[in-house]
Amino acid sequence: MSRTVQLVVIPGDGIGPEVIAEAVKALDAVTAGSGLAFQKTYFSLGADRYLATGDVLTDDDLAAIRGHDAILLGAVGGRPGDPRLAGANVERGLLLRLRFSLDHYVNLRPTTLFPGIASPLAAPGEVDFVVVREGTEGQYVGNGGAIRPGTPHEVANEVSVNTAYGVERVVRYAFEQAGQRRKKLTLVHKTNVLTFAGSLWKRIVDALAAEHPEVAVDYLHVDAATIFLVTDPARFDVIVTDNLFGDILTDLAAAISGGIGLAASGNINPVGEFPSMFEPVHGSAPDIAGEQRADPTAAILSVALLLRHLGERPLAERVERAVTTDLAARSGQMATASQTRTTSQIGDAIAALAAQN
């Protein structure tokens, strides 16, 4: 049965357009002849748009995006120190507004150490886990302020907001992920100090654990979790945590598995009320924009997350196998200057592999 998905594509700034072109190339290759088609609508959003119009994300933009099924995003951010962007806060005005307006309450970050990819760890073992980070609460809701700013008596605060409703829905999603994987879930928090929020998270995890007896559940303080991420990452299957802790842990997870250049993420509305968004974790790297030096692998892995979210697991696995094969070939070459490929050449290779699988 044929199916058409309405896809928003936001190339963004810097290397964003280059890597997203290769992601779309891989998407088209893997879906050719499958009965799954993507109707793509491109949106010019980001620092360049702001410099041209003074707008980051208008209400009309948001309304148009809401009418689609999913979003594929490249990277957002202008050149650091550009005085024309002073005070614009493009990343917050675009990315956080999309996440909150579209109720992306799950931030999903898979972590895999692919064969042939070097890790800074001496003996990492098998690294294959996902972090399910709450995406719309915690310290990121903007509940804070300052009095007497700029004086020796300044007081500033950021309130972490945790609701039973918000925690329960992200924990349910994490249990579902664990049930589809190796059936282990680890709650990471700081219950010994953050007693109110920590207690809420712990009680909800314990309550839902009774509904999922097949899933083994454990708990780690966030400081202990950082230790185990570098001493025994193979112990993890699904980590569930709040917005701030998840933000920190996921970058550490990327660092032990090849770097953020290989890290993809999903900002997900699991119930499908709004379009979910998929993007590479890396930034816009304006210093190399237009030079065809950016690695599009993370953007292509974002396509795999998109396909998996849409229920197209076989197609997602084809993309993942293509990436695995390409990465193994790269490590075998020990790329010299003459062997280094351009952004589009990497995309061509992965797309060809995805089409064959």
Curated annotation (Swiss-Prot):
Catalyzes the oxidation of 3-carboxy-2-hydroxy-4-methylpentanoate (3-isopropylmalate) to 3-carboxy-4-methyl-2-oxopentanoate. The product decarboxylates to 4-methyl-2 oxopentanoate. The record marks Y140, K190 as: Important for catalysis. It is found in: Cytoplasm. Substrate binds at R99, R109, R133, D223. The lineage of its organism: Bacteria, Bacillati, Actinomycetota, Actinomycetes, Micrococcales. Homodimer. InterPro entries: ICDH/IPMDH (IPR050501), IsoCit/isopropylmalate_DH_CS (IPR019818), IsoPropMal-DH-like_dom (IPR024084), LeuB_actb (IPR023698). One of its GO terms (cellular component) is cytoplasm. The gene is leuB. NAD(+) binds at G283, S284, A285, P286, D287, I288, A289, G290, E291, Q292, R293, A294, D295. Pathway: Amino-acid biosynthesis; L-leucine biosynthesis; L-leucine from 3-methyl-2-oxobutanoate: step 3/4. Pfam families: Iso_dh (PF00180). This is 3-isopropylmalate dehydrogenase. GO terms for biological process: L-leucine biosynthetic process. One of its GO terms (molecular function) is NAD binding.
